[in-house]
Swiss-Prot record:
GO cellular component: ribonucleoprotein complex; ribosome
Protein name: Large ribosomal subunit protein bL34
Pfam families: Ribosomal_L34
Cystine pairs: none
Keyword Ribosomal protein: yes
GO biological process, one term: translation
Organism: Buchnera aphidicola subsp. Cinara cedri (strain Cc)
């Protein structure tokens, strides 16, 4: 049986990357909340 996680950096960045986050209102909310918590990594 095939596993559910098949790693791919392109797909990872397109779905969870910074530009993907900034492209929607809710994604910008995620970035701002992570900035307010002073996260060292904002997104992938």
């Amino acid at each position: 049986m095939k596993r559910t996680f098949q790693p791919s950096n392109i797909r990872r960045n397109r779905t969870h990357g910074f530009r993907a986050r900034m492209s929607s209102k809710s994604g910008r909310n995620i970035i701002s909340h992570r900035r307010s918590k002073l996260r060292s990594v904002l997104c992938v």
